[in-house]
Amino acid sequence: YHEFACVQLHNTLMGRGDIIKETTLEIFNTKDKEYWNPIPKVSKNHMEYEVTSSEVDMWQSFDRSIGHHFNLSIDLNSCTGCGACVIACHAENNVPVVGKDEVRKSRDMHWLRIDLYYSSGETFKADDQTKEDIDGLGDSLSTFGKMEQASQNPQVAFQPVMCQHCNHAPCETVCPVAASSHGRQGQNHMAYNRCVGTRYCANNCPYKVRRFNSVSYTHLTLPTRSTV
């Protein structure tokens, strides 16, 4: 028999609609900016104080006065989760494959993934209400277990996720050999020949988009042949 590698349910989340922030343009324009971008607060002497982002930043800001700066925007109103961008990213960047055996172990390596969010109830709001009604640890375990199943007619949301090229990227600060570095154009750079494979960057990435390919298909041991 042949064992197929099915990846349809990879990166699929049920009952997690509370982390999806969706609204209409009318509501977005009528709400105050503090509603969408609340001012950060720190606790001092058990009192909360409003601070600016620069005051709580541990790192010095980069010089953005010169050079080009790149930006990528995704229209989530148009995204249908087809996965064509994942295939295009593979082709454009010549991303190496890991083989069918590794894919069966959920080790498929893409630089771009699409998270799929399905509601356990009819809507994401219904899921939020279900979570609000949870009473106690036992009820929590059973309820969240049931929410792992999607509704027959669920509300669906798609979220393409790739490297965010963070301003002060966590993957850069933990690399012991500076293989991950920050470029002048705002991009997160990676020096492959400097990497020693600690994978600290993957552990420290909040978006879980750092991928490792430990298999080198270009250095396979080939049978030696001698001529007489």
Regions found by a protein language model. Give the residues of each.
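Carboxylate/His-rich catalytic cores and anion/metal-binding grooves
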Residues: 82-140, 199-205
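Long, contiguous, secondary-structure-rich segments that constitute the structural scaffold
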Residues: 1-71, 77, 88-91
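Conserved small/polar residues in nucleotide/adenosyl-binding loops
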Residues: 218-224
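Gly-rich Lys/Arg/Thr-decorated short loops/hinges at beta-loop-alpha junctions or inter-strand turns
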Residues: 150-158
